[in-house]
């Protein structure tokens, strides 16, 4: 069999896309494969680092390369266990190489479309966690510090990282600002995070900015 780097199939875009395909198949009609891939494309396009590291076009190429490796070799047997299991589940009764090529073609076709707005295609839970990881993580901090005022909790979270707080502080405010733009209105992200209303997100931004102006003039 043609050699291939196992790490390419231990993680990365092929494994992610197979996971989304399985999720759609096992949702009993609640999820559409096309829509899950549209969300994947929207997520990659919306993150400069992700897009620079592995564009959607490249991800479709990885699927094609995988299909070639399966077809020219010993099937899925030489692949890492997690990849093999997901490929078998996703393909079902279809030849795995054929399924991977079909998935690659779907990705390529949908990549030609503009990304749908969130009002048109709501943000999925997995997409939310990738788009707002710091706000999602802040939820746990609020649970631990539930007796404090909201601004005090924000202040403590930033101060505890000082003087190495720049990365976290920037991430909190960036994600909060992005949430306010993407989800205008008083509820903002409340449907995903009970506390993340417009007022609370604005308070978070103001509190972090206050710390930065005071400690990092």
What is the meaning of each model-derived region?
Residues 27-76, 137-177:
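Amphipathic alpha-helical interaction modules
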Residues 1-45, 100-156:
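Short terminal alpha-helical segments
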Residues 20, 36-43, 61-69, 79-86, ...:
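Charge-rich, solvent-exposed alpha-helical interaction surfaces
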Residues 74-130, 188-217:
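Amphipathic alpha-helical binding modules
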Residues 18, 24-27, 72, 92, ...:
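An almost-null, non-specific background feature
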Residues 11-31, 46-50, 67-79, 87-98:
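Amphipathic alpha-helical interface segments
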Residues 1-4, 82, 159-202:
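Function-determining sites in protein domains
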């Amino acid at each position: 069999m043609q050699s291939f780097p196992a790490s390419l199939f231990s993680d990365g875009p092929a494994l992610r896309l197979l996971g989304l395909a399985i999720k759609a198949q096992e949702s009993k009609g609640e999820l559409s494969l096309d829509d899950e891939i549209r969300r994947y494309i929207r997520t990659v396009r919306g993150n400069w680092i992700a897009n620079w590291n592995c564009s959607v076009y490249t991800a479709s190429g990885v699927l094609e390369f995988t299909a070639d490796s399966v077809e020219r070799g010993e099937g899925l047997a030489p692949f890492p266990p997690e990849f093999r299991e997901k490929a078998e589940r996703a393909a079902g009764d279809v030849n795995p190489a054929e399924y991977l090529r079909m998935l690659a073609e779907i990705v390529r076709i949908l990549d030609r479309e503009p990304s749908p707005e969130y009002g048109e295609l709501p943000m999925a839970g997995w997409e939310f966690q990738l788009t707002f990881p710091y706000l999602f993580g802040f939820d746990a901090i609020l649970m631990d510090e539930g007796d404090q005022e909201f601004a005090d909790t924000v202040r403590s979270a930033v101060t505890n990282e000082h003087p190495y707080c720049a990365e976290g502080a920037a991430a909190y405010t960036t994600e909060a600002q992005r949430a306010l733009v993407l989800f205008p209105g008083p509820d903002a992200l409340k449907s995903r995070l009970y506390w993340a209303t417009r007022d609370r997100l604005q308070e978070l931004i103001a509190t972090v900015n206050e710390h930065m102006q005071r400690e990092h003039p």
